[in-house]
Structure formats: C-alpha cells, structure tokens
Amino acid sequence: MTTWVALLRGVNVNGITIRSADLAELLRGLGFDDVKTILASGNARFTADVDVQGRAELKARIERALRERFDYDAWIVLVTDRELEAATRAYPFDADDDDRQPYVIFCSETAVRDALVDAAASLDPEEDPTHPGFGVVYWSPEKGRTLDTPFGKLLGRAEYKPTTTTRNLRTLVKILGR
C-alpha cells in the first residue's frame, strides 16, 4: 500500500466548494483506505494499492470522479507522503520570515516544472525568490504580493492550471501530521 496525498487545485475559491466530508466520501467510494482530509483547501491523504508507476492512472481516475461528482474542471497533483515529506524538509528559504510567504509549487509534469524554473531564472531574485526542487518549485514572495509579482502572474496563467498547485509550507506540515 502506498500513502498518497491529493492536492486539489482551486477548491473552495472562485465558487468551487467541496466540503471535506464530501471529498472524503468520494475517495472512500473509489476504494481508498485511511482517508483523511486536511483543512478546507482541497488536501486529502489516503492509502491505495497503487505504486508510483500507477500515478498517472490514479490521478486521472480521481480527477474524473471529482468532475462527475462536483461538476467542475478538476485538477490535482498527486504525491506520495514520502515525496511530500522530502519537499517539505528541503524548503530552502527562511520559513519563519514574517515578511514572506513560504510556498511550494507542486507540478505534475516535469516539463512544466522545468518551464517555471527557466522563467524564474530571468526574474529579480529579491522580488521573486525561487529555487528548484524535485517535482516542485520553492517560492518566497513578500506577504501581500503573491498575485502581483512577475512569478505570481506567471503561475496564474491558464496553461498551468491543469498541472500545478501551490501550498503554504505550514499547510504541508499539517498534511504530514506534524
């Protein structure tokens, strides 16, 4: 059994509301065990008899079920608990800096992650500090500027919606149960 973490994009914002209990019920209905939802921002941890080679099929299955049940254009990033733990531990910036947000951008496709890393390389590192990680991009924008920095605007492009989602480091710690 593998412990998976589903990170749903765009849940409980822009009119897309999914209650945690409904999300848990959906995942249990798909045959997953040990289902736990964390916070109300589209985070769920569960176990399934699917290893990492089956990730793409598992992702597609969950997205299809979300679309059918909640009638919205569902996108998720699916990581194992070990991958999430590694991404959290490797955060390269000062997570306790009160003036900045400690973000981790998860990418379900390597090409997308690479494109974000390449784009970030041309930006001002003071305004948009980023750092590449395994399957992720770390980002530490000033508080209150998430949507208006060049990197923030880049992340908001429609082309990245199906393959990326951003989480605060504190949320990731809660997902891991620490």
Indicate residue ranges for each PLM-predicted region:
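Surface-exposed, charge/polar-rich loops and edge strands
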Residues: 2-178
